[in-house]
Amino acid sequence: MRFLLQRTAFYLFTAWAAITLNFFIPRLVPGDPVQSLISRNQGRISADAIESLRVLFGLDANENVWEQYLHYWGQLLHGDLGLSFTFFPAPVSTVIGDSLPWTVGLVGITTIISFLVGTALGVGAGWRRGSWVDGLLPATTFLSSIPYFWLGLVAIAVFAGPGSFFPSSGGYEAGLVPAFDGYFIPSAIQHSILPAATILVSSMSGWILSMRNMMVTVSSEDYITVAHAKGLSERRVALSYAARNALLPNVSGFALSLGFIVGGTLLVEIVFSYPGLGYQLFQAVGAKDYPLMQGIFLIITISVLVANLLADVAYLLLDPRTRKS
């Protein structure tokens, strides 16, 4: 319990520091976002509304940065992320709420599948060295070295095109309304196949390689020799003794990968024009959309910290030495 309290206190401090940076960094970007907003909406927003917009977006010239910072925290504590410049007058929470399910559905599922399959293959490759799984490593390592966006472009060039089953862009067929029905769901799955395959191919090698190396290291430990001497089955020794201890570094890496689900596949979403949160972040940076950038960074920060806390809990469950310390 003391360990968890210490880690929780550390993560709370880290969250405060990250949110503080989240407030200041966008304000260091050159340019005036309010003027940019008026230019994009020329004819619909009066230039006389500049000061009102500055107050609305927390950029009041009559307030110093410290007052703006306190105002920002007040909004956060009330669950108010402000209004988006890019999608004005839509609230940031609405924009994020519309995009987050796409990213979690695509990247979350593919990350979990990649971890489970890669870890299982890594256990086999490390426990039975020289097997067919070992032969996969050079190919998977080569594919994982290719950048996400380049692999995505290759996938589009090879598998997408006129008359192809695989769409090259978008999250669903034009004209459909997002809903849980027999028209939208198959279309969404069809549009997610290529980006999901790109992420799987690029990320699986890391899990295989790290798990294989840990299995090789663990297999030479004394407790593995003792387990064999006790007459335990090969399967039980491999899974209950070797894999359980070799899994610890992968658990930490998996938690971090879950934390980076939101922003880690930005380029994949851009290449496939996928309506996820990474693509929204790209648009927000280009439009100097402070509130949307801050909202997305906040989601990324919280997801990373929560994922690390879950990794600490997993360590407590998997490694008795952590509980004793």
Model-derived features: positions:
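Alpha-helical transmembrane segments of integral membrane proteins
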Residues: R2, L100-V133, Y148, L176-S325
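N-terminal signal-anchor/signal peptide hydrophobic helix marking the start
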Residues: L5-Y11
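Short hydrophobic helices that act as membrane-entry/anchoring signals
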Residues: Q6, E67, H71-Q75, G79, ...
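Residue-level recognition of pore/gate-forming positions within transmembrane alpha-helices
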Residues: Y11, G43-R44, F115, T141, ...
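Hydrophobic alpha-helical transmembrane segments of membrane transport/permease proteins
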Residues: A15-Q68, G163-F184
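Hydrophobic alpha-helical transmembrane segments of multi-pass integral membrane proteins
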Residues: W16-L21, V65, Y69, G108-I112, ...
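Membrane-water interface segments at the C-terminal ends of transmembrane alpha-helices
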Residues: L21-L28, H71-G74, A139-G170, T198-M204
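An internal, D/E-rich "acidic patch" concept
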Residues: D60-T119
